[in-house]
């Protein structure tokens, strides 16, 4: 069924056309066909109803609006991207400043990483101080301090002898010397101290003030040693440790100075000798 507007137009054209002009119209599959010998028909323009055109206009506006919205979003996204890049660049500059110098300005910038950098710098100083503290302490003496200026010894402290103590072991604990302790306590035989005995121990001794030899005398006269008791003329030049052995005892037994035995056993812990352990004995050249 053709729209009413089309039918009306055809009726008007038929009334206005000359009698000699014949027009035939017929419907073929729902289309209007004009014969070839017929006069050219007037150009027909289909008028759309206002109701039908309104949705199309609105759709067009909606499409434009959507495009505009997309463009706006794209613009905003571009601006946001630029802003993000700018933010990253500034953040990078701030981090660089903090990392290089712990810059106070970097701290004002509120950069958390900058703050941590400052703390780390302080921590580094603390670490250096800690190293300094260790340097000031006796190498083996724990809390013992002394000889920081290579001239002044540490204080004299009291120590109550416990099972396993020897003067040699106490020298390592308190950065002292065997003969320094012996002289301070009038000990005739440095190899003999009693459990429960209270000793006065000079601590933190400077290297040049440590004395481990002057009070050690050979218990026997050994013709196999030199005059000073620093070496053996003939062997054996090794010894297998037995339970209860110590460098002091071995030195006295052989007519040697303890330090002479210590010197030929680098890396051996003389305070923790183990049974069946082999040590060296000094050989005269």
UniProtKB/Swiss-Prot annotation:
Keywords: Repeat, Signal, Virulence. CDD domains: LysM. Disruption phenotype: Does not affect the virulence and the proliferation of the fungus in plant tissue. Residues 75-143 are annotated as: Disordered. Residues 85-116 have a biased composition (Basic and acidic residues). It comes from the Eukaryota. InterPro entries: LysM_dom, LysM_dom_sf. SMART domains: LysM. PROSITE patterns: LYSM. Residues 117-139 have a biased composition (Gly residues). Residues 1-16 form the signal peptide. Gene3D superfamilies: LysM domain. Induction: Expression does not seem to be up-regulated during plant infection. The LysM (lysin motif) domains are small globular domains involved in binding chitin in eukaryotes. Slp2 contains 2 LysM domains. PANTHER family: LYSM DOMAIN-CONTAINING GPI-ANCHORED PROTEIN 2, MEMBRANE-BOUND LYTIC MUREIN TRANSGLYCOSYLASE D. Belongs to the secreted LysM effector family. In plants, chitin acts as a microbe-associated molecular pattern (MAMP) that is recognized by lysin motif (LysM)-containing plant cell surface-localized pattern recognition receptors (PRRs) that activate a plethora of downstream immune responses. Might have a role in sequestration of chitin oligosaccharides (breakdown products of fungal cell walls that are released during invasion and act as triggers of host immunity) to dampen host defense. This is Secreted LysM effector slp2. It comes from Pyricularia oryzae (strain 70-15 / ATCC MYA-4617 / FGSC 8958). The lineage of its organism: Eukaryota, Fungi, Dikarya, Ascomycota, Pezizomycotina.
């Amino acid at each position: 069924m053709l729209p009413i507007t089309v039918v009306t137009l055809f009726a008007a054209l038929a009334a206005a056309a000359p009698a000699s002009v014949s027009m035939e119209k017929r419907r073929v599959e729902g289309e209007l066909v004009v014969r070839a010998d017929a006069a050219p028909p007037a150009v027909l323009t289909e008028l759309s109803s206002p109701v039908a055109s309104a949705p199309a206009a609105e759709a067009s506006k909606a499409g434009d609006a959507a495009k505009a919205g997309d463009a706006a979003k794209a613009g905003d996204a571009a601006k946001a991207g630029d802003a993000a890049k700018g933010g990253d660049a500034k953040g990078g500059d701030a981090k660089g400043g903090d990392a290089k110098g712990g810059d106070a300005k970097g701290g004002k910038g509120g950069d958390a990483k900058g703050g941590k950098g400052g703390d780390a710098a302080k921590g580094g100083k603390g670490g250096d101080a800690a190293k300094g503290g260790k340097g000031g302490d006796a190498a083996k003496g724990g809390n013992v301090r002394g000889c920081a200026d290579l001239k002044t010894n540490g204080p004299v402290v009291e120590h109550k002898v416990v099972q396993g103590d020897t003067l040699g072991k106490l020298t390592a604990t308190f950065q002292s010397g065997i003969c320094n302790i012996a002289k301070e306590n009038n000990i005739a035989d440095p190899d003999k101290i009693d459990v429960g005995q209270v000793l006065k121990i000079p601590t933190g001794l400077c290297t040049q003030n440590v004395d481990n030899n002057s009070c050690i005398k050979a218990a026997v006269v050994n013709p196999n040693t030199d005059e000073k008791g620093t070496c053996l003329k003939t062997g054996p030049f090794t010894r297998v440790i037995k339970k209860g052995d110590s460098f002091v005892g071995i030195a006295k037994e052989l007519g040697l100075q303890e330090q002479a035995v210590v010197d030929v056993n680098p890396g051996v812990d003389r305070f923790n000798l183990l049974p069946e352990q082999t040590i060296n004995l000094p050989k005269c050249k």
